[in-house]
Amino acid sequence: MRTSKYLLSTLKETPNDAEVVSHQLMLRAGMIRRLASGLYTWLPTGLRVLRKVENIVRQEIDNAGAIETLMPVVQPFELWEETGRSEKMGPELLRFTDRHVRPFVLSPTAEEVITSLVRNEVSSYKQLPLNLYQIQTKFRDERRPRFGVMRAREFCMMDAYSFDINKEGLQKSYDAMHDAYCKAFDRMGLEYRPVLADSGAIGGSGSQEFHVLAESGEDLIAFSTESDYAANIEKAEAVAPTTERAAPTQEMTTVDTPNAKTIAELVEQHGIAIEKTVKTLFVKASDEVDADIIALIIRGDHELNEVKAENLPQVASPLEMADEAQLRDLIGAGAGSLGPVGLELPFIVDRSVAVMSDFGTGANIDGKHFFGVNWDRDVQLGQVEDLRNVVEGDPSPCGKGTLQLKRGIEVGHIFQLGTAYSEAMNCGVLDANGKNVILEMGCYGIGVSRVVASAIEQNNDEYGIVWPEAIAPFTVAIVPMNMHKSERVKEAAEKLYAELTAMGIEVLFDDRKERPGVMFKDIELIGIPHTIVIGDRSMDEGHFEYKNRRANTKEAVEMANIVEHIKAQLS
């Protein structure tokens, strides 16, 4: 490709509204342009990368035995009513009506559409297993689109759906897709981790996310220092620091704490260690509880894991905190002075709190706390659950090593849906005995456009993008110095361009009438892995200059050997 016939569209300055590195560099490198909030046009350079990611994903998903299809981005609303997700998805599901006032949605995912298709097309166990996928535009009406294509409203996604006669078949399909994901991300040259995850609004049982590791990642992932255990912060199991509760050494006393409305103030003003405090959080209760609100009790230095809390049958979903008026009406005190001692409302205790002794907690009277509290002496322990986020150094739940935390960007997710959708939509087949069997489903997604941004977050330097070779927009750049003034430079550049392109190598030939400094900066910004510089001075010495973008090195290569040198770099 010649730059004179290409839309390069690079920018010298970083746009003010670009927060993260990938957004900044995608704009500066001429990969995308914003059309509206969360909506982006992919320019030629960006589209080349997007297509390469797509093709790698397509090849590996094909190799896993899946079959490509293409479903409409517009879906009938009635399908979403069949599964009950029409309300569960909330405002992210964009709804509209056509001219006949028939309701539709813009597809954020396609479980309903694919299940409807399979129930009409597949009738016998002999047609199974079946795995169908598409690479298609999706739309989610994000409340706050940000970070460029990382969290856009419109995005490109690979979504696949497997159908099996039993759970054993589902596990095989799931494992095959897990392996396909690993092969795809390996080929892309990304540092990533598969982690245990919560199934969220998709539903189902087993689920794993694939995270590209990056400091800018929105998600925290926890992994063991001595095993393969890894989970996102929502799913990571928090193990108590000990299995034994120490014997009480203090009597319970009442302490005046008029100015301590937070754990931090309690610790600062009264000298109690933060790990000896507990905080009591009140949330709306579900219909399973004979109360309007329920208390969740965690250690003072820990954070409530809202996903774990919401998954408890006693807690209303979505999670909603009780307000101050409710607390005063039911307990007679406000937040900051509440605790389990004497509490006449149901409560659930975190594992770490269950092994505490001699701890401090609110006394359910404004401006007062109890110190020296002990379970089963001053208050009955009751139900114990995992309620908190893990922290660095926690014991790994696998029993090996401790947990470390890193930031990651979710680029893929795989689910074992089971019969959650197939049962709701009556999707079954006749088995070998002629009996109707509801199908076991799996669901698999890769955010193709998000992979592009994630790769940049992981691969950049002060000069621009440093693409992994497999997904770079071009493999080689040819930069001829003053070719419009030097005929022999032009001839050498044209000859080399013809040779490399004939070999199937993707080359960007910078034939612009520009200053060398401008050309070099653009090539580095775009992130092309290999650059060949051709100039009169180097030709006088019988060589071209070769630059390696990732290694940030340059070397003189004899003119006659340059093609072989490039071939060696690419092997």
Swiss-Prot record:
Superkingdom: Bacteria
Reaction(s) the record says it catalyses: tRNA(Pro) + L-proline + ATP = L-prolyl-tRNA(Pro) + AMP + diphosphate
Keywords attached to this entry: Aminoacyl-tRNA synthetase, ATP-binding, Cytoplasm, Ligase, Nucleotide-binding, Protein biosynthesis
Documented EC number(s): 6.1.1.15
GO CC aspect terms: cytosol
Subunit record text: Homodimer.
Role description: Catalyzes the attachment of proline to tRNA(Pro) in a two-step reaction: proline is first activated by ATP to form Pro-AMP and then transferred to the acceptor end of tRNA(Pro). As ProRS can inadvertently accommodate and process non-cognate amino acids such as alanine and cysteine, to avoid such errors it has two additional distinct editing activities against alanine. One activity is designated as 'pretransfer' editing and involves the tRNA(Pro)-independent hydrolysis of activated Ala-AMP.
Name of the protein described by the UniProt record: Proline--tRNA ligase
Organism annotation: Aliivibrio fischeri (strain ATCC 700601 / ES114) (Vibrio fischeri)
